Amino acid sequence: MDQKQIEEIVRSVMASMGQDVPQPVAPSMQEGAKPQCAAPTVTESCALDLGSAEAKAWIGVENPHRADVLTELRRSTAARVCTGRAGPRPRTQALLRFLADHSRSKDTVLKEVPEEWVKAQGLLEVRSEISDKNLYLTRPDMGRRLSPEAIDALKSQCVMNPDVQVVVSDGLSTDAITANYEEILPPLLAGLKQAGLNVGTPFFVRYGRVKIEDQIGEILGAKVVILLVGERPGLGQSESLSCYAVYSPRVASTVEADRTCISNIHQGGTPPVEAAAVIVDLAKRMLEQKASGINMTR
């Protein structure tokens, strides 16, 4: 699917919902987008916010032969280029920013989604067999199964046999859920309903792994299950969300090749509203073809 097709899908879905098509965010406003650089500078400041756009655009090469080339290179990528060296070692600011980004990534793995936040979104909360974050990181197999209490809650509080069941889970990035939720779930649910699909009760799974959607689909009798889950964070990118969609999942028979994945959903990647429109189109095609993953025809 090329960019033109994606834009057409977004226009179609947003128009059917009676909403304006969102305009692309300017690159300078996107996290992870190409930074806007001033003239190269070698000044290092302890007061600089290491997570700021200014820090990301910092050029630490001393006495450059072609400063304009460095500026253009720094603009062209979010990678760690033009940071300079102090002999064989990285410069202080470059090292501190590296450590800060690494810490941010670790923090989002270890943080918990606040229960108050889940309640504020009006979501039913259930858990996998995991009881705490440490167990979640060391026993991924338990994160693929719902707890007995969760199974009872789904059977008693959720719509049975929906066309599409939407599930939200923290996964390996708390920030991915809290940062993107309001921009992806409301338009996603509205788009699915506007398409005439029977949408199940959306809910939140704490400590969930991707394969848990198979058990959810089997219990609720859903034709398509859409799981929005936090991705494993990269260095300095802790807000990336993934969508795993599967048709008629079964615990015993569904394999990873049966899933269709849309990854890198965040303001510096695929914008959440755009992703919602693409997911709506994907769900419709899954229902038409009665397939997902590698079994779908393009």
Swiss-Prot record:
It is an enzyme of class 4 (lyase). GO terms for cellular component: ethanolamine ammonia-lyase complex; ethanolamine degradation polyhedral organelle. One of its GO terms (biological process) is amino acid metabolic process. InterPro entries: EutC (IPR009246), EutC_C (IPR042251). Pfam families: EutC (PF05985). Its cofactor is adenosylcob(III)alamin. Binds between the large and small subunits. It catalyses: ethanolamine = acetaldehyde + NH4(+). Its EC number is 4.3.1.7. Adenosylcob(III)alamin binds at residues 210, 231, 261. One of its GO terms (molecular function) is cobalamin binding. Signal peptide: none annotated. The keyword Lyase applies. Pathway: Amine and polyamine degradation; ethanolamine degradation. It is found in: Bacterial microcompartment. Keywords: Bacterial microcompartment, Cobalamin, Cobalt, Lyase. Belongs to the EutC family. The basic unit is a heterodimer which dimerizes to form tetramers. The heterotetramers trimerize; 6 large subunits form a core ring with 6 small subunits projecting outwards. Catalyzes the deamination of various vicinal amino-alcohols to oxo compounds. Allows this organism to utilize ethanolamine as the sole source of nitrogen and carbon in the presence of external vitamin B12. This is Ethanolamine ammonia-lyase small subunit. The lineage of its organism: Bacteria, Pseudomonadati, Pseudomonadota, Gammaproteobacteria, Enterobacterales.
